Every structure is written in C-alpha cells, then in structure tokens.
A protein has these predicted regions:
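Repeated scaffold domains used in trafficking and secretory/extracellular systems
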Residues: 39-52, 107-121, 168-179
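Beta-propeller fold detector
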Residues: 25-39, 92-110, 152, 159-168
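Long, acidic/polar, low-complexity amphipathic helices and coiled-coil-like
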Residues: 1-54
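Membrane-embedded hairpin module used as a gating/binding unit in multi-pass transport
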Residues: 37, 41-93
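Short coil/turn segments that connect the beta-strands within blades of beta-propeller domains
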Residues: 57-59, 123-125, 180-182
Length: 200
C-alpha cells in the first residue's frame, strides 16, 4: 500500500462497461454505467475472474457478485463499503447502454446465493458458481468461503436451475469446457476417488 493511493474502488455499487465500435482499442469507448449492481468481476485473492459474457444473440450480460460489501473502511485506506446484492444487468446487442427493463437479483431467486464465477454455455444459458452458504459467508469467509454450488441461469427468463447429482464433497477445478450446448466441469473430491468430468 502506497500512502495517498486508494487501493479500492470508491464506487462499489456501480458497474461500468466500455463499449468499443469495432476492434480498434485506440478509439474512445462509450461508457455504459448502472447503479443497479456493483462492479462486475469475480475474485479469488489477487486473481480477478471474468463476469461479462455475450449470449449467442449478441446480448451482453453483466454479472456482479456484490463484492463491494466485503470492503472494510479505515481512516488510512478510505475504502467505501458497498450495499448492492449479487445481480445481473443486460446490454442488448448493438446498444451502448444498459437495458433499463432488465435486472436480476440473485439473492432473491433460486437458492438466493451470490455468484462467485460464471460462464456462458450456449444461447442465453450461463453456468453459475455460487457461494453455497449465502452472502454472509461471502462477506465474512474470505477465501475460505464455500463456493461448491453450481446452477444454470437462463438469462432471458431470469430463472435459475440448481445443478444436482454432484458429489457432496465436490470441489471444482478451473474453468468448464463448453461444447454443443453442454458444459463439462472438472470435479475433485476428498474421499480418495479420482477426479472426474461432469456433463451439465
């Protein structure tokens, strides 16, 4: 930490997306902003995870774990603690701003748990890795929080389907592989069994 440098966002309850016209990153992008969700990224220690994905029709879905709530302020760091729950917003294909009619609060649907990571599977289906014990564990558990829950999110319908049939002590290794509408997730267990791929 360098004195005078703020080590965290001062806007934890806002999400910003830079939209470029074409493939030239030298151009000035249009910045889409929303205050319905917090900043969009997953995180484990110093590694940040992608949580912005496009559906097959070009609509872009922006997912937020609601990590602003984990920031603890102090007089020297001057962090800002967020309040927004885990959620998702949409930018329609070709648009340059968030869809005002689309908002999902993941802590009000399905198992009501915040997301840890997410991946596009096919069409408007996304695989979500969730905090199994809820928002309180995410906020207080840090890197020890239980993230062993999976669900499939159908974005257009705003519905979540829990993934069942996984080992009770299953942990997930890395990122899933997607092909032909299926996600293949590497799963490890603590019972001595060999790791295996599960088809979702």
């Amino acid at each position: 930490y360098t004195a005078g440098v703020i080590p965290s966002t001062q806007y934890p309850d806002n999400a910003y997306v830079a939209i470029y016209n074409g493939t030239n990153f030298n151009e000035t992008p249009v910045i889409a902003k929303t205050d319905k969700i917090g900043y969009a990224c997953g995180r484990m220690r110093s590694q940040y995870y992608q949580t912005i994905w496009a559906a097959d029709n070009g609509d872009v879905y922006v997912f937020s774990p609601g990590y602003g709530r984990t920031a603890v302020s102090s007089s020297d760091l001057k962090k800002v603690t967020g309040q927004k729950p885990s959620g998702a917003m949409r930018i329609k294909a070709g648009a340059t701003d968030f869809d005002p009619d689309y908002y999902v609060n993941f802590e009000e649907i399905g198992t009501k748990h915040p997301i840890f990571r997410c991946w596009h599977i096919s069409e408007d289906y996304f695989l979500l890795q969730l905090y199994k014990k809820g928002a309180e564990d995410m906020i207080n558990g840090g890197t020890s929080a239980d993230v062993s829950e999976l669900a499939v999110f159908k974005a257009e319908d705003q519905t979540i389907m829990p993934v069942t049939g996984l080992p009770a002590d299953g942990k997930f290794g890395g990122e899933p592989y997607g092909e032909k509408g299926y996600a293949y997730m590497a799963v490890t267990v603590t019972t001595g069994e060999k790791p295996a791929f599960y088809k979702i």
